Amino acid sequence: MTDKAPQKTHLNIVIIGHVDSGKSTTTGHLIYKCGGFDPRALEKVEAAAAQLGKSSFKFAWILDKLKAERERGITIDISLWKFQTNRFTITIIDAPGHRDFIKNMITGTSQADVALLVVSAATGEFEAGVSRNGQTREHALLAYTMGVKQLIVCVNKMDLTDPPYSHKRFDEVVRNVMVYLKKIGYNPATIPFVPVSGWTGENISSPSQKMGWFKGWKVKRKDGFTKGQSLLEVLDALVPPVRPANKPLRLPLQDVYKIGGIGTVPVGKIETGILKPGMTISFAPSGFSAEVKSIEMHHEPLQMAFPGFNIGFNVKNIAVKSLKRGNVAGNSKSDPPTEASSFTAQVIILNHPGFIKAGYSPVIDCHTAHITCQFAELQEKIDRRTGKKLEDNPGLLKSGDAAIITLKPIKPFCVERFFDYPPLGRFAARDLKQTVAVGVVKSVEHKAGAAARRQVQKPVLVK
């Protein structure tokens, strides 16, 4: 392979939504229609699904590689699949919908360029998904927090509305979802709403005869409007993300594997910079350094990996147990990542039943890391719209408040200023099985021995 990036732009799409909204089935059908599956493999899966009485999960089953997942009927970890459209090479991240698996869902979102929110139009199912405890709301909020600017809404299970393929029901679902997405911060005019049936395949790759009333989706872009009919047309109309290849390397690890005959293979998505075989890289917060022997993406060797690539790479002389999910890899010779002893952030409290005081210690989800951090100091309460200071050293914070706070990680943690490396500088704070706050990192105090770098960033306006 040459040192040039492949001609088709890479896009990472995370599939989000409430459990049983039909995410895996819709995704599986989409990949199937785009030729991403071997027909013979599909026949085997169909036979196995029929044997277990799960024929209705056929396309979802294609995505459920793990045996444990098949038996439990829930997508647990994040599955990665690849297919081609006319314009893009798309990697699908199929994220779990069960509340218990929200941590995996956050990890998937942090890797994505685009979120495809699947909502069920089936009677009762939509209402459950958007209820206060449903995941539709939380997933959409997390996607926005993690910086996923492009969102597609797939109104699924149109074959199960009353009557089937109901125009009225589609409009009702769209109206409800639009209100919530606007509250989060998305502009509904930029979001395509597409009616589909993941099970029958209606309107996935070509316009549906059963939904003649659907005149197509239309979205606003900087250069005018874009429109189309099917879900596949939406994917081809996406705006390619700007990839910061000229910044130093930052690669948060998603997992680390030991592969027989090869050795230690960390995997993850390059957020910034470029990775090449022969490069010496450092991992933070673990502190280890190693040489990159080889790089692979979708089982193909690469001589250069660019931002947005989901890759696996082999490193020399480093044990699997020395690295783990949440470590960040960087070029040892160019602004390598380091462990944070504390960091200052601008946060918005979204959902806490009481008051938050100094000492509060939620789990912070940032890039692929999940680390408990203490709200060590509440520095100032600010106006969430203007960023102006309202109060110094507030005694407590409640839902709706915005503040500048200092956080101290309980375990080793690598974060960056949002200004320098956005994907490593935005986070969600979780407690009580829900997202209690979201924030952006303004400055980082690096652990003794790490180079003291960078000045404090100006307040970031969070809408």
Curated annotation (Swiss-Prot):
GO terms for cellular component: cytosol. It comes from the Eukaryota. Residues 94-97 are annotated as: G3. Keywords: Cytoplasm, Elongation factor, GTP-binding, Nucleotide-binding, Protein biosynthesis. Residues 156-159 are annotated as: G4. The keyword Ribosomal protein does not apply. InterPro entries: EFTu-like_2, G_TR_CS, GTP-eEF1A_C, P-loop_NTPase, T_Tr_GTP-bd_dom, TRAFAC_GTPase_members, Transl_B-barrel_sf, Transl_elong_EF1A/Init_IF2_C. Residues 8-245 form the tr-type G domain. One of its GO terms (biological process) is translation. Residues 17-24 are annotated as: G1. Its main location: cytoplasm. GTP binds at residues 17-24, 94-98, 156-159. Residues 197-199 are annotated as: G5. It is found in: Cytoplasm. PROSITE patterns: G_TR_1, G_TR_2. Residues 73-77 are annotated as: G2. This protein is one of two protein components of a 42S RNP particle that is very abundant in previtellogenic oocytes. A major function served by 42sp50 appears to be the storage of tRNAs for later use in oogenesis and early embryogenesis. Purified 42S particles can directly transfer aminoacyl tRNA to ribosomes. The 42S RNP particle comprises four subunits each of which contains one molecule of 5S RNA, three molecules of tRNA, two molecules of EF1-alpha and one molecule of the 5S RNA binding protein 43. NCBIfam families: EF-1_alpha, PRK12317.1. This is Elongation factor 1-alpha. It comes from Xenopus laevis (African clawed frog).
